[in-house]
Amino acid sequence: MTDTEKSFKVVLLGEGCVGKTSIVFRYIDNIFNDKHLMTQHAGFFQKHINIGGKRICLTIWDTAGQERFHALGPIYYRGSQGALVVYDITDNDSFIKAKNWIKELKTMLGNDISLCIIGNKCDLEKTRVIPLADAEAYAKSVGAIHYSTSAKLNKGIEELFLDLTRRMILNSSGVVIHSNTNTTGQTTNRSERIPIVPDSDSGNKQPGCCSN
């Protein structure tokens, strides 16, 4: 990060196999791997963008979603300015678990964090089990914005991160970012993917395949 850049920490939460890492890969490097394995550790990615004439460095923390990693969550989202809580629109349990993540976030970080709830895998609309209206109503009830995305089809990803960044800028400085602000000229530096806290038990578990 340069002296003129503003840095924001964003934490990515949700159960395993909802497509969290696929969303980040699509945003950072515009790639999608339908053979992507379940994340077995936490790590972060960085992207540098220009938005509203401001230089922004986003540090996006991707966390493992398995139950045995849940207790580590507070370690990673402490100090975050933004949170993306992801669920799979074809998996009701993932939506229930997303609500648990949000309760925990609210308890620890209060209402100051910019919160987005993401219904991922919208390319599987025919098998949707979470009504969009229900998800949007829940998001509104907790002060969040709901987004529908598909990492596979690259749908809604760019808009999600740009809108989140605008909200974090607004929360941190009070500067109003108008909806007609030109944000299409964003630039990126080489992204960094640095795994941390490796899973010492990963060799004993057969990872699942998670994408979309």
Curated annotation (Swiss-Prot):
GO MF annotation terms: GTP binding; GTPase activity
Induction annotation: Activated by limf and repressed by ChLim.
Domain of life: Eukaryota
Single GO cellular component term: pathogen-containing vacuole
Keywords: Cell membrane, GTP-binding, Lipoprotein, Membrane, Nucleotide-binding, Phagocytosis, Prenylation, Protein transport, Transport
Pfam families, per database record: Ras
InterPro entries xref list: P-loop_NTPase (IPR027417), Rab21 (IPR041833), Small_GTP-bd (IPR005225), Small_GTPase (IPR001806)
Bias (Polar residues) ranges: 201-212
Residues binding GTP: 14-21, 62-66, 120-123
Chain residue ranges for the region called Disordered: 181-212
Chain segments annotated as transmembrane: none
Cell location: Cell membrane
Effect of residue 66 to L: Alters cortical F-actin organization and increases the rate of phagocytosis by 2-fold
Gene Ontology BP terms: cell motility; cortical actin cytoskeleton organization; filopodium assembly; hypotonic response; intracellular protein transport; phagocytosis; positive regulation of phagocytosis; Rab protein signal transduction
Topology within the bilayer: Lipid-anchor
Lipid sites, type S-geranylgeranyl cysteine: 209-210
Gene3D superfamilies: P-loop containing nucleotide triphosphate hydrolases
Self-association state and partner proteins as the record states: Interacts with LIM domain proteins limF and ChLim.
Role of this protein: Involved in the regulation of phagocytosis.
Family to which this protein belongs: Belongs to the small GTPase superfamily. Rab family.
Entry protein name: Ras-related protein Rab-21
Organism: Dictyostelium discoideum
